[in-house]
Amino acid sequence: MGYYDDDGNYHSFRRGVERAVDRITHPFHHHHHDHHDHHREEVIVTDERGPVRYRDGVKENVRIVEPRGAAATTSETVPIPTHFIRVGDILVLQGRPCQVIRISSSPMTDQRRYTGVDLFTRELHEESSFVSNPKPSVVVQTMLGPVYKTYRILDIQEGTIVALTESGDVKSGIPVIPQGNLYQRIKDAFLEGRGSVRALVINDGGRELVVDYKIIHSSRL
């Protein structure tokens, strides 16, 4: 048994499950494998633009969890195993979309607890992981991540984008999260014109925010 990836390549479950899950959980950072190293130093800085992570002196950008294919349902959230969650990821904490700035665990139960900054209000929220026992002696911990919308960027306008939604509507004035120089990177990619630039958008009761982007090259359009 196996699965087909986005490029139509077949992968065996026996050899590819862990790699596939890592790509799904961190779609824009699957080339990094150092997240299993629990001894790396992480420094979290929170300022007026939002939390920023520095790992080994390198500033890292917002990272998100994006469901793909059949997983991208109409649900507002998607479950994420806790062992794939890192500081800097976006989760739903207390019903709010937040960027994780702290992860702790109970010394007695090893249950994870996450602290994050609300992407829209900048308030702090905390929530513990959901623990289940699908089989005897098997413990699974999960958290909820938001389901993202993918919009095709049509134009760039002073810190916002004009985009074609999944339903075919045109929306203007969608703000870009002011972090990690994201707006400038989107602008550069759009002006280069090497492919169709897609914005990954999070929704909060009608308010929308661009939190990342990807480029779809002509061979995959």
Curated annotation (Swiss-Prot):
Location within or outside the cell: Cell septum
**Main site of residence?**
other
> Could you give a single Gene Ontology term from the biological process aspect?
translational elongation
Q: Which domain of life is it from?
A: Eukaryota
Q: Which GO terms describe its cellular component?
A: cell septum; Woronin body
- MF terms in GO: ribosome binding; RNA binding; translation elongation factor activity
**Family matches, as InterPro entries:** Hex1_S1, IF5A-like, NA-bd_OB-fold, Rib_uL2_dom2, Translation_prot_SH3-like_sf
Motif range (Microbody targeting signal): 219-221
Q: How does it assemble?
A: Forms oligomers. Self-assembles into hexagonal rods.
Protein purpose: Major component of Woronin bodies, fungal-specific organelles that occlude septal pores in order to separate intact from damaged compartments. Hex1 binds directly or indirectly to the Woronin body tether that in turn is anchored at the rim of the septal pore.
Q: Which family does it belong to?
A: Belongs to the eIF-5A family. Hex1 subfamily.
Q: What is this protein called?
A: Woronin body major protein
The species is Emericella nidulans (strain FGSC A4 / ATCC 38163 / CBS 112.46 / NRRL 194 / M139) (Aspergillus nidulans)
